[in-house]
């Protein structure tokens, strides 16, 4: 039987077998801007469920991202070398207070994968969460990581030198975030409760905000993309029963 509430989709006849498929979409769990939806379906006595997350930024952070492309709680270094028209600010104090990394734990869909997994499957539209005691290096053997994803870690996240991530990704860390030399991020939101470093020759389209120091090394290209502030919707996955 279907849960109460939610949206019931009109019943469909399945052929062969003349089964009736009943399905509904339900909001199951919500906390700190993260909503979990379940699509439950039954046909011929079988039931299955898919889940999907919608991850929205706290309003305070969204407002900040609308004002600045780069913003730091402590110091901001190197932003003056970027192309004109990029709004940036340093010494803003604790600007990411409304962001709690631990809030993502209950919604975790995947562990941080290995080089070869990134290589083969890309980010796959999932929320990756890690609360371990080691920093995470995001790398693929070919240096290409396709697909959208949200990477959240208690410790630092390092994007390896030369890595190309063309699709929408959100990177959130309680530690530091480092974008390696000559790395290319096609559409990225970087949020660190500590420091962010964009190494020389890297190219980023998006927005970067941190509570600590933000360092932009030489020959970096940083282009504003305000669309990274929109809610991130994960791909449908089979629900873990």
Residue ranges and their predicted role:
Residues 1-5:
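Membrane-proximal N-terminal amphipathic helix
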Residues 228-241:
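Short, low-complexity, Pro/Ser/Thr/Gly-rich segments in the mature regions of secreted, periplasmic
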Residues 13-146, 151, 155-165, 169-228:
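Short, ordered "entry" segments at domain starts
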């Amino acid at each position: 039987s279907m849960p109460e509430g939610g949206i019931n989709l009109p019943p469909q006849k399945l052929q062969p077998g003349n089964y009736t498929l009943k399905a509904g979409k339900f909001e199951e769990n919500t906390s700190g801007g993260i909503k979990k939806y379940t699509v439950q379906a039954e046909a011929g006595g079988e039931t299955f469920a898919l889940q999907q997350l919608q991850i929205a930024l706290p309003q305070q952070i969204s407002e900040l991202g609308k004002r600045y492309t780069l913003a730091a709680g402590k110091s901001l270094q190197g932003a003056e070398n970027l192309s004109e028209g990029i709004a940036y600010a340093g010494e803003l104090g604790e600007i990411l207070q409304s962001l709690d990394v631990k809030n993502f734990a209950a919604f975790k869909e995947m562990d941080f994968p290995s080089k070869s997994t990134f290589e083969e499957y890309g980010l796959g539209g999932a929320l990756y969460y890690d609360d371990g005691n080691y920093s995470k290096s995001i790398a693929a053997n070919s240096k290409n990581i396709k697909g959208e994803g949200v990477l959240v870690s208690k410790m630092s996240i390092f994007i390896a030198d030369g890595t190309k991530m063309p699709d929408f990704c959100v990177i959130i860390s309680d530690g530091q975030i480092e974008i390696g030399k000559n790395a290319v991020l096609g559409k990225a939101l970087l949020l660190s409760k500590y420091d962010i470093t964009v190494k020389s020759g890297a190219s980023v389209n998006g927005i970067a905000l941190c509570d600590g120091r933000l360092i932009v090394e030489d020959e970096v290209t940083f282009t504003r993309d305000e669309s990274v502030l929109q809610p991130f919707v994960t791909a449908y996955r089979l629900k873990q029963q």
